[in-house]
Curated annotation (Swiss-Prot):
UniProt main location, coarse: plastid
Enzyme Commission (EC) number: 1.97.1.12
Protein name per the record: Photosystem I iron-sulfur center
Molecular function terms from GO: 4 iron, 4 sulfur cluster binding; electron transfer activity; metal ion binding; oxidoreductase activity
Pfam assignment, any one: Fer4_21
Species, as recorded: Pinus thunbergii (Japanese black pine)
Gene designation: psaC
Amino acids binding [4Fe-4S] cluster 2: C21, C48, C51, C54
Chain residues that bind [4Fe-4S] cluster 1: C11, C14, C17, C58
Amino acid sequence: MAHSVKIYDTCIGCTQCVRACPTDVLEMIPWEGCKAKQIASAPRTEDCAGCKRCESACPTDFLSVRVYLWHETTRSMGLAY
């Protein structure tokens, strides 16, 4: 089952989540909205193992990157699983 990876605008562009991901789901892309001029992106969510290492690596108090496991996603959408 696929997991969902959400990057929030509290991302500070530090690259910690990208480096922590064992399956290379995340990458940095240019973004003018933060001091680092880059933000995390999740173009390969189909490869997400659901380990949440990216969440653990995030230094912000707001968890700028969140992994929603497949059962959390279907439950929040009101879908059967």
